[in-house]
Amino acid sequence: DATSNLDPTISTLVGGGNAFVLADSRTEAGMTEIFGAETLPAAVLYTRDDFIAENPKTTQALVNALYKALRWLETATPEDVVATVPEEYYQGNPAIYAEAVKNSLPTYSRTGLVTEEGEKAAMELLSFDPEIASAKVDLAATFDPTFVEAAGKN
């Protein structure tokens, strides 16, 4: 049997002796080996152009909050992260959640910016869908760094 999953599921299975890791996307080396990029844009702020145009202050506030969280993660310990999330996140096992955070932190962006290699890797990952694979996508137009760059100046 095999699974493709995220933490804390992987840490729980490995920690319980019920699984071993063949390919690990929780590390930069693993991300590069699997996806061809050190980071993969996944947990990002998704919004439409019309929302941004109508709500630039709200958009900036949301990006500022995410940017501040990324900066906090530079010095936070996994235990600090556990202390900030709802108990339901770690389902009664804060130690395994802390292990999951420790394993995943290296792949988190520290700048909030999406790299060109990350854009390409995301497109390749989603190209299993024939509709996406055949689409003409201007990757440079899918990620707007303007608000992240402004957050970095605050």
Residue ranges and their predicted role:
Residues 17-18, 113, 153:
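Intrinsically disordered, low-complexity regions
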Residues 1-86:
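Pocket-lining segment of extracytoplasmic ligand-binding domains
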Residues 120-154:
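Conserved C-terminal helix/tail region of periplasmic/extracytoplasmic solute-binding proteins
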Residues 48, 115, 144-148:
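Residue-level signal for threonine
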Residues 32-35, 109-110, 145-152:
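Short, solvent-exposed polar/charged micro-motifs at secondary-structure junctions
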Residues 52-132:
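Secondary-structure end/capping motifs
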Residues 1, 18, 95, 130-139:
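A local structural motif
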